């Protein structure tokens, strides 16, 4: 009855570090666990301090440039080159991390459900050149994707032809759906690459004659309703298998199915794919799933991210991980 599972109030553990000071939105500390000898290798530091600078990359770089920090969680955009220029070491990871611009098919806007119409969803995708979003949104630090959220690094990925880019056809399809004059609202978080990607998408929609306005929200607001917005951009971390991504994000009724996509054929094929252990055998079914994703205009998924982390000379074990993990037992400082 006296057990308290909060690690801040009752820091008991078998690892090399325990939580120390903690202030939400400001900082957190890990301190060496003196209660036992760490049986693994490493864990050479007395204390590790995490500092929260928010989404402002300029503030993060200022901390780097002033020597306030020894490494960053992630280096983004122009700040990759800036940290290169000051001589910090750079580590890269090729990933299946991405951003998805998705329409919520069940969302109501002024009493209607504009994105329930597949023509509207496909028109949005046809108006956007994914290569432009990679260039303007993420400084070309990655590879162009194909609007189905299965990556070439997933073992069961099926090769697909390039995404169709046809702004004139997009405008015609939007008009056919009776939505030529409808103003879309594209919502994103206020950080650099997700904001920039959404800005570039909105610009291309306007160039195609599709009205759109942008709404940019701070993180504390955006994540409250991220799965409910009618049209928004969300970043997704990689999963080891493509079937994991599709099951988590696109199967009917799943909590994280932010597109509200519900398709019986897709669900049946996904169940079949999940039952096939061999990736090469599973690929045939995955090809059908990927094609449904594109035919139904479920997401605009423009690129796969290469991700970077910088650290100052003498920091050890700080290399970037495909899912952003920091293995604190490996962190250390050169003698």
Predicted regions and their residues:
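Gly/Pro-rich hinge or "lid" segments in bacterial periplasmic/extracellular proteins
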Residues: 1-41, 167-168, 172, 335
């Amino acid at each position: 009855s006296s057990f308290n599972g909060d690690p801040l109030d009752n820091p008991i553990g078998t690892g090399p570090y325990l939580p120390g000071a903690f202030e939400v939105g400001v900082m957190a500390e890990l301190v060496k666990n003196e209660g036992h000898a760490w049986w693994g290798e490493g864990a050479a530091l007395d204390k590790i301090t995490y500092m929260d600078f928010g989404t402002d990359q300029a503030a993060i770089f200022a901390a780097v440039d002033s020597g306030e920090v020894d490494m960053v969680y992630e280096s983004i955009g122009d700040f990759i080159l800036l940290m290169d220029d000051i001589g910090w070491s750079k580590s890269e990871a090729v990933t299946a991390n991405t951003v998805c611009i998705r329409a919520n098919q069940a969302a109501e806007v002024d009493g209607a459900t504009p994105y329930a119409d597949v023509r509207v969803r496909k028109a949005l995708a046809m108006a956007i050149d994914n290569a432009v979003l990679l260039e303007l949104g993420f400084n070309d630090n990655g590879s162009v994707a194909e609007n189905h959220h299965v990556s070439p690094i997933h073992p069961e990925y099926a090769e697909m032809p390039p995404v169709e880019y046809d702004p004139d056809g997009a405008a015609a399809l939007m008009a056919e759906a009776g939505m030529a004059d409808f103003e879309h609202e594209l919502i994103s978080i206020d950080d650099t690459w997700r904001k920039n990607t959404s800005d570039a998408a909105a610009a291309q929609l306007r160039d195609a004659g599709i009205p759109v306005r942008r709404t940019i929200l701070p993180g504390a607001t955006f994540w409250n309703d991220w799965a409910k917005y009618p049209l928004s951009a969300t970043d997704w971390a990689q999963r080891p298998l493509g079937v994991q991504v599709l099951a988590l994000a696109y199967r009917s009724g799943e909590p994280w199915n932010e597109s509200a996509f519900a398709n019986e054929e897709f669900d049946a094929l996904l169940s079949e794919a999940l039952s096939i252990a061999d990736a090469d055998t599973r690929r045939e079914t995955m090809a059908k799933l990927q094609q449904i994703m594109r035919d139904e205009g479920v997401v605009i998924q423009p690129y796969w991210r290469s991700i970077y982390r910088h650290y100052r000379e003498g920091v050890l074990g700080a290399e970037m991980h495909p899912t952003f993990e920091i293995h604190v037992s490996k962190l250390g400082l050169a003698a």
